[in-house]
Amino acid sequence: MNTLGHQYDNSLVSNAFGFLRLPLNFMPYDSDAEWVITGIPFDMATSGRSGSRFGPAAIRQVSTNLAWEGNRFPWNFDMRKRLNVVDCGDLVYAFGDAREMSEKLQAHAEKLLAAGKRMLSFGGDHFVTLPLLRAHAKHFGKMALVHFDAHTDTYANGCEFDHGTMFYTAPNEGLIDPTRSVQIGIRTEFDKDNGFTVLDAPQVNDRTVDDVVAQVKQIVGDMPVYLTFDIDCLDPAFAPGTGTPVIGGLTSDRALKLLRGIQDLNIVGMDIVEVAPAYDQSDITALAAATLALEMLYIQAAKKGE
């Protein structure tokens, strides 16, 4: 099978079917696609349980259970008729070479963005967001980050490849403006002086959705936004299949409502990460991720109107 790298793909974690049964296009750069889905089967930057390299395959597989619905509830229209989306398969890299993965992912993203495409990416561990941010910042300039997670990922431990350090590195590289960025669902220790607005899980759960959304919009304003969703933002009751689960998180219903609430933001790139199917039960984590990913596409399609 031809792949992003023009190589034969003998990966044990890739697959030959597209998200939501969407068309597969391994050379999407010259296509007429508006949004391109890329799988990133990488988990070498994990600090807890590994296995998120199998996340893209799990998300795609369970997404077939969502493909039947035409006018999806509650949107009442079919995203596929408004938005041209293709799945370009998984990034191919030398397994064990984190630097090669990072460089190839950034190059792939830069090429897509230069061709006028937008990206929805499936991790893999959360480190994959950093090369994606580098590519998006080259194209759009400094961005705001809207970040759903149980952890802030702003730790300065000096490790180059670590899924807990991206949002320490990204502001230092000038990729994002933390004062215009929001981290949602946090419920672990973090440095309160890093500049981000942190809406921790207790307050997000206790406040109304409209109240939280209004604060996010006020902070972000009209900046270009990169949206990243670590599945461990959800409570383990809704997403047990992840490397570093933390109780006390968001419900899947609240997460969907928050995504719908921020649809008016200028979202220029999106990802969903940290699905580790080995720890899942009845595919509920993969289903949550696939549904959230589909919701991300719907908020883009809604902007186009009829």
UniProtKB/Swiss-Prot annotation:
Disulfide bonds: none
EC number: 3.5.3.11
Any one GO MF annotation of this record: manganese ion binding
Entry keyword Repeat: no
Example GO biological process: putrescine biosynthetic process from arginine, via agmatine
Binding site residues for Mn(2+): H126, D149, H151, D153, D230, D232
Transmembrane segments: none
Reactions performed catalytically: agmatine + H2O = urea + putrescine
Pathway: Amine and polyamine biosynthesis; putrescine biosynthesis via agmatine pathway; putrescine from agmatine: step 1/1
Keywords: Hydrolase, Manganese, Metal-binding, Polyamine biosynthesis, Putrescine biosynthesis, Spermidine biosynthesis
Cited Pfam families: Arginase (PF00491)
The protein's required cofactors: Mn(2+)
Annotated function: Catalyzes the formation of putrescine from agmatine.
Stated family: Belongs to the arginase family. Agmatinase subfamily.
Protein name in UniProt: Agmatinase
Organism the protein comes from: Cronobacter sakazakii (strain ATCC BAA-894) (Enterobacter sakazakii)
Lineage, highest ranks first: Bacteria, Pseudomonadati, Pseudomonadota, Gammaproteobacteria, Enterobacterales
Gene (UniProt): speB
